[in-house]
């Protein structure tokens, strides 16, 4: 679960390396975000000459969460670190590559572009 002040790694080549969640979108009092949810983030660490700079406020889609997710078949999937992909207002990725695996739950949330760019879908 991702909430305000949670630090996440960035799983794309947009130029950001680390971001912090400042808002969970989707409802007035929504507190937590999980895989596939859109959040508002602030860039805390970025590489030089990237598309985004430190201090930028952007949207991101959560692609990996540390807490385990239960699937309908009863299996549990969890990742080592929390990670997100920077997206624009139309929910299209800013970067051109995705690093690391992404869960297939993104397909149900209509993030097909992220699924197609990912090297592995679990």
UniProtKB/Swiss-Prot annotation:
Q: Which InterPro entries match?
A: Ribosomal_uL14, Ribosomal_uL14_bac-type, Ribosomal_uL14_CS, Ribosomal_uL14_sf
**Molecular functions per Gene Ontology:** large ribosomal subunit rRNA binding; structural constituent of ribosome
- Write the record's keywords in alphabetical order, separated by commas: Ribonucleoprotein, Ribosomal protein, RNA-binding, rRNA-binding
Which superkingdom, per the lineage?
A: Bacteria
Output the Gene Ontology cellular-component terms: cytosolic large ribosomal subunit
Which PROSITE patterns does the annotation name?
RIBOSOMAL_L14
Instruction: Give the signal peptide as a residue range, or say none if absent.
Output: none
List the GO biological process terms.
translation
Which Pfam families does the record cross-reference, listed alphabetically?
Answer: Ribosomal_L14
Q: How does it assemble?
A: Part of the 50S ribosomal subunit. Forms a cluster with proteins L3 and L19. In the 70S ribosome, L14 and L19 interact and together make contacts with the 16S rRNA in bridges B5 and B8.
Task: Return the similarity comment.
Answer: Belongs to the universal ribosomal protein uL14 family.
> What HAMAP family does the record tag this protein with?
Ribosomal_uL14
Functionally, this protein is described as follows:
Binds to 23S rRNA. Forms part of two intersubunit bridges in the 70S ribosome.
Q: Would you tell me the protein name for this molecule? A: Large ribosomal subunit protein uL14
């Amino acid at each position: 679960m991702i909430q305000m002040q949670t630090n996440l790694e960035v799983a794309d080549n947009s130029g950001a390396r680390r971001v912090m969640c400042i808002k969970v979108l989707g409802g007035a009092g929504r507190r937590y975000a999980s895989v596939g949810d859109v959040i508002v983030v602030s860039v805390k660490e970025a590489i030089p000459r990237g598309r985004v700079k430190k201090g930028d406020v952007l949207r991101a889609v959560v692609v990996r969460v540390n807490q385990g997710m239960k699937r309908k078949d009863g299996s549990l999937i969890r990742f080592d670190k929390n990670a997100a992909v920077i997206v624009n207002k139309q929910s299209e990725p800013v970067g051109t590559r995705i690093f690391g695996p992404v869960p297939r739950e993104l397909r149900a949330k209509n993030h097909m572009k992220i699924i197609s760019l990912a090297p592995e879908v679990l």
